[in-house]
Amino acid sequence: MSLNVVILAAGKGTRMRSDLPKVLHSVAHKPMVQHVIDTARELNADNINLVYGYGGELLKAKLGEQPLNFVLQAEQLGTGHAVAQAIDHINDEDTVLVLYGDVPLTRKETLEALLAARQPDGVAVLTVHLDNPTGYGRMVREGGKVVGIVEQKDASPEQLKINEINSGIMALPGKRLKAWLGRLENNNAQGEFYLTDVIAMAHADGVAIDTAHPANPIETEGANNRVQLAALERAYQARRAEELMLAGANLRDPARIDIRGDVTVGMDVMIDVNVIFEGTVKLGNNVTIGAGAILIDCDIADNADIKPYSIIEGAKLGDSASAGPFARLRPGAELHKDAHIGNFVEMKKAVLGEGSKAGHLAYLGDAEIGKGVNIGAGTITCNYDGANKHLTVIEDNVFVGSDTQLVAPVVIRKGATLGAGSTVTHEVGENELVITRVKQRHIQGWQRPVKKPK
């Protein structure tokens, strides 16, 4: 039996006040609909159909490289009409799971429970009990069994008292669903074809209707405006912060962290406030992350220390390495064990060897730097000639004085010393001292220029 997912994503989202389709608005730096697609993939869905309307070209541009069936709903005539647009992609033997592109926080485990609750050839609906169910469709039961769903605008005063609401998420048998969709009518207050009407049809046909419930109602909430979108963002971040703490991270303030990707942590990790994670980030044991740091697609080994306001992107830090404050590691940068870069040091496609240090104010690009090297303040590897990048090699135990320019391609051999203010353009031999600065001159009685009157 195949799992066939239908994601409803045709709404314009007028209340967002945006040219962007509602489902492309982001939670954790990812479109809401992408969260839904990713969850469907976690369920090993055999087929995913995305029913779209407004902004179809934008949706395809953003999502089109994925294996999806894009299905147009030219007119928004209700949820039942939307699902019916995907009927050509549904086989009789399929289990059809209906999801919503603006409901991004539904967990895989919740959907697994929903699918498990569905009896063979039966229907299962994800429902929630709310203290204030206003605005939602109500689950109508008789003798404890579901017999139908009534929308808010069509509900009687007695039905409005029901606090079990329909989330809209449901699992249905493919063959029966296709038959029910063909029988839908729009004689209701909205003049729409409701998917929820198939529940009454299922009851009339003697089909078993079961329910499942999320651990938290936030899993079924969508976003119709930016206030609700912000609430989803906070809920998502709270969930991810809890996951990190349970995995061994100590968060200085769980409400002040921003996780926009996949973060794995070792034991006794310390994360200060306002840290941002993007992409895939791995933190080893006893790692410390200072306030305001940004980590993107990086691998941080045990005991490493990232000080406040550093940006680490596409980089690796070895055991007990440290960076910052205000350091920037760009893609291809790597600090080996016990290496250190300080404030306002930038590295790109550069390796800093074990125990080497660049304390402050340096640019190290396209460089291979050995062990025990000292990089003085103001050092620059001049790696670009206007057309191509070139490599600088600094071997072990080299001392580079402050304000030194290394014009690549160039090699500095073991134990060499470069005097402050030098511009090095040729290879330096082992244990050599190189000084290239101009000889100091003294001019007595020097008169400074005088400003001319305006």
Curated annotation (Swiss-Prot):
Q: Establish whether keyword Transmembrane helix is in the entry.
A: no
Annotated positions binding acetyl-CoA: 377, 383-384, 402, 420, 437
Identify the Gene3D superfamilies for this entry.
Hexapeptide repeat proteins, Spore Coat Polysaccharide Biosynthesis Protein SpsA, Chain A
- Cofactor binding description: Binds 1 Mg(2+) ion per subunit.
Give the region (Pyrophosphorylase) as residue ranges. Answer: 1-226
- Localization terms from the record: Cytoplasm
One Gene Ontology term of the biological-process aspect is:
cell morphogenesis
Any matching Pfam family: Hexapep
MF annotations from Gene Ontology: glucosamine-1-phosphate N-acetyltransferase activity; magnesium ion binding; UDP-N-acetylglucosamine diphosphorylase activity
Relate the assembly described in the record.
Answer: Homotrimer.
Entry-linked PANTHER family: BIFUNCTIONAL PROTEIN GLMU, NUCLEOTIDYL TRANSFERASE
**Family under the similarity heading:** In the N-terminal section; belongs to the N-acetylglucosamine-1-phosphate uridyltransferase family. In the C-terminal section; belongs to the transferase hexapeptide repeat family.
- Return the protein name: Bifunctional protein GlmU
Origin organism is Shewanella amazonensis (strain ATCC BAA-1098 / SB2B)
Q: Which gene encodes it?
A: glmU
